[in-house]
Curated annotation (Swiss-Prot):
It is an enzyme of class 7 (translocase). It comes from Sorghum bicolor. SUPFAM superfamilies: HydB/Nqo4-like. It catalyses: a plastoquinone + NADH + (n+1) H(+)(in) = a plastoquinol + NAD(+) + n H(+)(out); a plastoquinone + NADPH + (n+1) H(+)(in) = a plastoquinol + NADP(+) + n H(+)(out). It is found in: Plastid, Chloroplast thylakoid membrane. PANTHER family: NADH DEHYDROGENASE [UBIQUINONE] IRON-SULFUR PROTEIN 2, MITOCHONDRIAL, NADH-UBIQUINONE OXIDOREDUCTASE 49 KDA SUBUNIT. This is NAD(P)H-quinone oxidoreductase subunit H, chloroplastic. Its EC number is 7.1.1.-. GO terms for biological process: photosynthesis, light reaction. Keywords: Chloroplast, Membrane, NAD, NADP, Plastid, Plastoquinone, Quinone, Thylakoid, Translocase, Transport.
Amino acid sequence: MSLSLKRKDLMIVNMGPQHPSMHGVLRLIVTLDGEDVIDCEPILGYLHRGMEKIAENRSIIQYLPYVTRWDYLATMFTEAITVNAPEFLENIQIPQRASYIRVIMLELSRIASHLLWLGPFMADLGAQTPFFYIFRERELIYDLFEAATGMRMMHNYFRIGGVAADLPYGWMDKCLDFCDYFLQGVVEYQQLITRNPIFLERVEGVGFISGEEAVNWGLSGPMLRASGIQWDLRKIDPYESYNQFDWKVQWQKEGDSLARYLVRVGEMRESIKIIQQAVEKIPGGPYENLEARRFKKAKNPEWNDFEYRFLGKKPSPNFELSKQELYVRVEAPKGELGIYLVGDDSLFPWRWKIRPPGFINLQILPQLVKKMKLADIMTILGSIDIIMGEVDR
């Protein structure tokens, strides 16, 4: 009996879904010819919770605790975009002190997100030591968050018009101490990782994206800047107080997994520079614009001032979203996080569209892994840096 050797026997392998604390509930259906990847189909939706529809049935203040469940490793950014949307829609002014506090919290959150990308990324490549190092630094950031907000994760700290509470006494000194310590940690990472020949063999030239491809696919964040495009919303479209600080956009021109690693490590250095400047320059004054708490809903004449008979409790301070639409965006650790908001003169948004960076960056994965080896899938997927909470929403 002779077997035909002309037909290639392809193998279909399911990768994932993994636990949300690891790579997330992403399923990849991979078609293999030996160890060569022929095709890859991502299956999404395992963590879909209807976040956009929930927003349309809540006021913004009621919805704030939900948004930290999008990207649960960079929760300050989801809170920032949620309060920025109604602030821009209603032209609510932010006190300068509140803006500086927001910048400090956002950059600390950026560092924490990049750290928790770096550790598992290195573990995927077989390097276990950095995985334990990053948790040491991340723990210090979470201690700062806990002292300022009361929560290590899911902070619920941002408010429309400012922040929930001022920074406690001595917090800024601890923050500066962390900055000095962390800069030494970044040097340690680079000595341990960047010049490691085994690491370079795994990432150099793997997952190449040209600048033109990155723009055509709509990529953002480190994925875009690693392909030679110097696009950072903190410089291009400044928000909060970023235009008052001296820092540089981190970018590389190689477009491979190594370039994306170098961009994120460079961003951690720049975040420290921004935090140090913000702490030194932070002005005094209020930390919240209390005008945003005014309840502006007009009385209904049909009730004839008898509302109190039908209300079980006094309504919380809120305001109506005027009948207009806008798109706001921030530079999150993974890319451009945006909100398309449509108001219709009611307390609830008529439309709340989330533009998650991870969802759009993930679309290029099948193209990147084709004609690569099976082991390169985890390298490429790790270099994209996705969180399924924001991908599936």
